[in-house]
């Protein structure tokens, strides 16, 4: 039996299931997500941006005022709201996977782990001055990154798809995901 990438069949077989992109901060969830959404004819949501709208505060301000646990509480509430919808590609926060209660929502959709190599991840975080990363504030970023990767690895590994990233562009990563989606939902050639 052969399988072939047929965009309309892939979209139909997905049946509106939400695609959740998980991975470390800087893994490319927010940049890959819009490209994947376009391929799937879905809408795109950046969960951190939605949290900022709901909380009327920036992620870094929530971390300062409420602490990480306070932020994670809001993140879980927003995830539950997102989970009520359909036909979305969602760029989640890097630590969303650390709460087991979130997996009840995530497993209703398809979870895709974006996993750039450590050097690429660190280079992205170092070069991106537009995004504040509260967990990296006032600490050695490499040590923090290594620690977070170690803490979250098994949680990320629960994803339905694991996408290793070397130097691919967000557009290329979206195409790889689309192809792998067609394989896991087994779109048969007519």
Curated annotation (Swiss-Prot):
It catalyses: shikimate + ATP = 3-phosphoshikimate + ADP + H(+). Gene3D superfamilies: P-loop containing nucleotide triphosphate hydrolases. ATP binds at residues 26-31, 133. Its cofactor is Mg(2+). Binds 1 Mg(2+) ion per subunit. The keyword Transferase applies. Keywords: Amino-acid biosynthesis, Aromatic amino acid biosynthesis, ATP-binding, Cytoplasm, Kinase, Magnesium, Metal-binding, Nucleotide-binding, Transferase. It is found in: Cytoplasm. GO terms for molecular function: ATP binding; magnesium ion binding; shikimate kinase activity. Its EC number is 2.7.1.71. Pathway: Metabolic intermediate biosynthesis; chorismate biosynthesis; chorismate from D-erythrose 4-phosphate and phosphoenolpyruvate: step 5/7. Its main location: cytoplasm. Mg(2+) binds at residue 30. One of its GO terms (cellular component) is cytosol. Substrate binds at residues 48, 72, 94, 152. It comes from the Bacteria. It is an enzyme of class 2 (transferase). One of its GO terms (biological process) is chorismate biosynthetic process. Catalyzes the specific phosphorylation of the 3-hydroxyl group of shikimic acid using ATP as a cosubstrate. Monomer. Belongs to the shikimate kinase family. This is Shikimate kinase. The gene is aroK.
């Amino acid at each position: 039996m052969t399988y072939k990438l047929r965009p309309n069949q892939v979209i139909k077989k997905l049946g509106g299931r939400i695609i959740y992109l998980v991975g470390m901060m800087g893994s490319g969830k927010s940049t890959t997500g819009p490209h994947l959404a376009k391929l799937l004819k879905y809408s795109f949501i950046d969960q951190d941006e939605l949290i900022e709208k709901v909380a009327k505060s920036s992620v870094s301000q929530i971390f300062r005022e409420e602490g990480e646990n306070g932020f994670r509480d809001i993140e879980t509430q927003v995830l539950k709201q997102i989970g009520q919808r359909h036909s979305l590609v969602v760029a989640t926060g890097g630590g969303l996977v650390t709460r087991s209660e979130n997996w009840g929502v995530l497993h209703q959709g398809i979870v895709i782990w974006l996993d750039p190599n450590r050097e690429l991840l660190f280079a992205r975080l170092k070069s991106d001055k537009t995004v504040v990363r509260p967990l990296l504030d006032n600490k050695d970023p490499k040590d923090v990154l290594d620690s977070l990767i170690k803490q979250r690895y098994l949680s990320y590994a629960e994803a339905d798809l694991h996408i290793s990233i070397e130097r691919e562009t967000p557009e290329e990563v979206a195409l790889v995901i689309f192809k792998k989606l067609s394989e896991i939902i087994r779109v048969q050639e007519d």
